[in-house]
Amino acid sequence: MLETESSVCDNIAGNEKWRAEAEIGGNERALQALRELIIFPFRYPLEARTLGLKWPRGLLLYGPPGTGKTSLVRAVVQECDAHLIVLSPHSVHRAHAGESEKVLREAFAEASSHAVSDKPSVIFIDEIDVLCPRRDARREQDVRIASQLFTLMDSNKPSSSAPRVVVVASTNRVDAIDPALRRAGRFDALVEVSTPNEEDRLKILQLYTKKVNLDPSVDLQAIAISCNGYVGADLEALCREATISASKRSSDSLILTSQDFKIAKSVVGPSINRGITVEIPKVTWDDVGGLKDLKKKLQQAVEWPIKHSAAFVKMGISPMRGILLHGPPGCSKTTLAKAAANAAQASFFSLSCAELFSMYVGEGEALLRNTFQRARLASPSIIFFDEADVVACKRGDESSSNSSTVGERLLSTLLTEMDGLEEAKGILVLAATNRPYAIDAALMRPGRFDLVLYVPPPDLEARFEILQVHTRNMTLGDDVDLRKIAEETDLFTGAELEGLCRESGTVSLRENIAATAVFNRHFQTAKSSLKPALTIEEVETYSSFRKAAKRSDSKPIPINKKKATSTVFGFSWQLGVLSLLLLATGNYYFNHTKHELLVASAT
């Protein structure tokens, strides 16, 4: 049984005040495309005949589930008082051969009979990827259905007058449909219905709460900001859960409060992130001791483009696409990344080398692509790579694990995805490594890792602040002097200082299980069993990389003197004139790069 409907309000067609925006929040681009496809051919037939314009036959809407593709079509159909026929895999698929094709023919015949000069007829095909999948993954029945649909759409010839039938289809897997459907003459236009941004989420929340009583304390703007990655269906479920929470509290006066939305948000999450752990970290800048200058740089690079995006657009500034944090192990690189994500209220996707290196061919690359796709849908978002040197190690380095084919494929995929961030908004790649020399040079250029920050071991003041952070929930004895302990823990990293505080508490409990405070003797006992893993030589090595990175931005690439001369003189005399030309060119090149050669030989 086909789902057939006309506009339920006969007076809507004559009421110019009602528009689809009354029931749809955001998605202006898709709304305009649908209006042009459905309404324009019937509103401007004379202009079309004058210009010889042939209107498109079909429009394909694609995007994640729950973004409102079906609602968009229904709203525009209602706005223009069109006749609508809805086809779905459930309504088309039949048990016996030939019956599915008959359903399609009947639908197009019914649409043609209702199409008149001033009233369009629309066929909406939902989940078209199920009806017409790619040819390498379909059954015999799918072949027959696809062939019948091709025939029916091709018979719906466009002309200078209005088309007989307008075909609109939707899918959340645009790459899974038959490519023959996407060619010109069938689905001429493809329009993405993307995940709503902050402004669109606010409009959707206002639509779903316009008939309920809201407490003055409810800030829909703040709720919209906190709902990264939520689609329209998720926001509808959020409002429904908030109403249920309010009804449980009091059935007499149904007033939604901020607490109701907080409870609802703990129940309803973004559907695009189901199956993976994606959350905004609860780590704040206060949880990171010291590193004031570094935190300020991260705030400017991560927070500002998200919180002040309008200012960046106004100034014509492109936000950074990647930031690399390098430094010794245990110096709070991961904590800094989480604090930046929390401050920017961005979704946080964390990937480690263990997740990306799989025994199955192509699985790691698929996970990488899928993570970037989910990050685009849940923007603003941060993708964090821990131990980035394993995934992005130098190609051709025989001593590295990345010399394998798997590592090279992962690196190629990462480079491709990072280059694709130029068109995406609100996505930042954060990476951390304690082997910056091992990172492939292709990633170290601007446009990929635009900012390279050195996370040094904590100095005296930073160690004091770190000790304060990790002892703020502990009861300390009067004889505990954290500043003195900081002076005694030179070369200790943040992770080692955290371990020192934890071990001190454990020593206190070993002494007396009923202990209520930690005293200085406990810290001294714990410190005697802990040794810093860092050495002065290692710290100097990390510092030298930072200095070398700064020099490489301003100095020309050094040339090896031996290699330059041997390239010229290695040719034999039999090459005649060609060898003389090469020799002259080499001498000219050598003389004009003498300074660079001296620098190279000195280093």
Curated annotation (Swiss-Prot):
Q: Which PROSITE patterns does the UniProt record give?
A: AAA
Q: Which SUPFAM superfamilies match?
A: P-loop containing nucleoside triphosphate hydrolases
Q: Name where it's found.
A: Nucleus; Cytoplasm, Cytoskeleton, Phragmoplast
Residues binding ATP, per UniProt:
63-70, 327-334
Q: Does the keyword Protein biosynthesis apply?
A: no
Q: What is its main location?
A: nucleus
Q: Which UniProt keywords apply?
A: ATP-binding, Cell cycle, Cell division, Cytoplasm, Cytoskeleton, Nucleotide-binding, Nucleus, Protein transport, Transport
Q: Which GO terms describe its cellular component?
A: cytoskeleton; nucleus; phragmoplast
The protein's matches in InterPro entries, at most eight in alphabetical order, are given as: AAA+_ATPase, AAA_ATPase_domain, AAA_lid_3, ATPase_AAA_core, ATPase_AAA_CS, P-loop_NTPase
One GO BP on record is: cell division
Instruction: Name the family.
Output: Belongs to the AAA ATPase family.
In UniProt terms, what function does this protein have? Probably functions in cell division and growth processes. Interacts with certain SNAREs as part of specialized membrane fusion events where vesicles from the same organelle fuse (homotypic fusion).
In terms of PANTHER family, this protein maps to: AAA+ ATPASE DOMAIN-CONTAINING PROTEIN, AAA-FAMILY ATPASE
Q: What is this protein called?
A: Cell division control protein 48 homolog B
Q: Which organism is it from?
A: Arabidopsis thaliana (Mouse-ear cress)
Task: Recite the lineage of the species.
Answer: Eukaryota, Viridiplantae, Streptophyta, Embryophyta, Tracheophyta
